[in-house]
Amino acid sequence: MVLLLNCIVAVDQNMGIGKNGYLPWPLLTNDFKYFQRMTTSSVKNKQNLVIMGKNTWFSIPEKNRPLKDRINLVLSKKLKEIPHGAHFLARSLNDALKLIEQPEFVNKVDMVWIIGGSSVYKDAMNYSSHLKLFVTRIMQSFETDTFFPEIDLKKYKPLIEYPGVPSNTQEEKGIRYKFEVYEKNY
């Protein structure tokens, strides 16, 4: 099975994605709806798989775990048991991708979405696979302590248009942002 990986992330002007385990900007409702739509839209009788690190999992409010209508897989080298509410646990992205190649997953999983954090994004971007990056580019700086890896434009081609991705600049709560899509081919 040829694996199509997607990363979805919101970044500020300095590629910051988090502060103390949380988003450093106020909730942007349209970006949140975009995240939900992109990560839940799947073909009939299948669900998308969301892969996240342990810290990302625990940053999701407990009442919202697991992310509904998606198969939730948590990555951790330290956890011995699947966190309450998660569906699967793997030690690495590589282990997770091997797991979903098993026959019982092939018929259940449509798309794979990497949703954080920083080290999981880095692993995905270095993985030898076709990859799309869905980036919400916030057009200002925030105080951050966690960053998304630099996007190497020699490897990643920006897509001018992509179905279902608004191309116009958005604004909420005085914060301007735009949706971008990049594609890496292997």
From Swiss-Prot:
**A GO molecular-function descriptor:** dihydrofolate reductase activity
User: What Pfam families does the database record attribute to this sequence?
Assistant: DHFR_1
Q: What is its EC number?
A: 1.5.1.3
Q: Residues of the signal sequence? A: none
Keywords associated with the record: NADP, One-carbon metabolism, Oxidoreductase
**Enzyme class name:** oxidoreductase
Q: Would the keyword Protease turn up in this protein's UniProt record? A: no
Known PROSITE patterns for this protein? DHFR_1, DHFR_2
Q: Tell me, what is an example of a GO biological process annotation in this record?
A: folic acid metabolic process
Q: Which family does it belong to?
A: Belongs to the dihydrofolate reductase family.
Record's protein name: Viral dihydrofolate reductase
Q: Which species does this protein come from?
A: Saimiriine herpesvirus 2 (strain 484-77) (SaHV-2)
The gene for this chain is DHFR
